[in-house]
């Protein structure tokens, strides 16, 4: 699938980010926000989706020019209710919830206009069980 857009996840430092980019990653995802990773991604023109769950983390992401963030773990930090609350002061931010997203709540998350995408291990688990 040459047209597939493949990235790297759970990237937590600059060295891992550079390794992922050298391996061909087209985007980077982190469980938290790393200024070092953000700067490397910006310099290489690669999207970076850091984990942000508090207003402070979201403001730090915005200061770095990042407007789409990973919301992880979504189930621990309040799920869709929290996303809706955070969207009030940050209407320009889109979220990618992961952690606790499953077939039972997938449509509810995707129906919210501030959700850019979702992630979850259930995609892989279901494919492996076939």
Which sequence ranges carry the predicted segments?
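Catalytic cores of alpha/beta
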Residues: 13-23, 56-64, 81, 87-88, ...
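N-proximal accessory regions
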Residues: 73-87, 91-99
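Glycine-rich phosphate-binding active-site loops on the catalytic face of alpha/beta enzymes
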Residues: 31-37, 70-80, 114-130
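Aromatic/hydrophobic pocket-lining residues that form π-stacking "cages" and hydrophobic walls in ligand
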Residues: 37-41, 57, 83
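Glycine-rich beta-strand-to-loop/alpha-helix junction loops that act as flexible
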Residues: 8-9, 97-100, 118-121
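Glycine-enriched alpha-helix->loop->beta-strand junction motifs that scaffold or abut catalytic
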Residues: 1-3, 22-28, 43-49, 63-68, ...
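Catalytic beta/alpha-barrel core
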Residues: 4-12, 17, 24-33, 47-58, ...
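Short capping/connector residues at structural and topological boundaries
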Residues: 98, 106, 128-129
């Amino acid at each position: 699938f040459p047209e597939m857009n493949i990235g790297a996840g759970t990237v937590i430092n600059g060295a891992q980010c550079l390794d992922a980019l050298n391996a061909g990653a087209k985007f980077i995802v982190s469980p938290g926000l790393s200024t070092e990773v953000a700067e490397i991604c910006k310099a290489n023109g690669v999207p970076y989706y850091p984990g942000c769950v508090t207003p402070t983390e979201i403001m730090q992401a915005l200061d770095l020019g990042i407007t789409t963030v990973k919301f992880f773990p979504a189930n621990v930090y309040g799920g869709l209710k929290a996303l809706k609350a955070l969207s009030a002061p940050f209407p320009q931010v889109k979220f990618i919830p992961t952690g606790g997203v499953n077939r039972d709540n997938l449509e509810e998350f995707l129906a919210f206009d501030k959700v850019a995408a979702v992630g979850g291990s259930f995609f892989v688990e279901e494919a492996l069980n076939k």
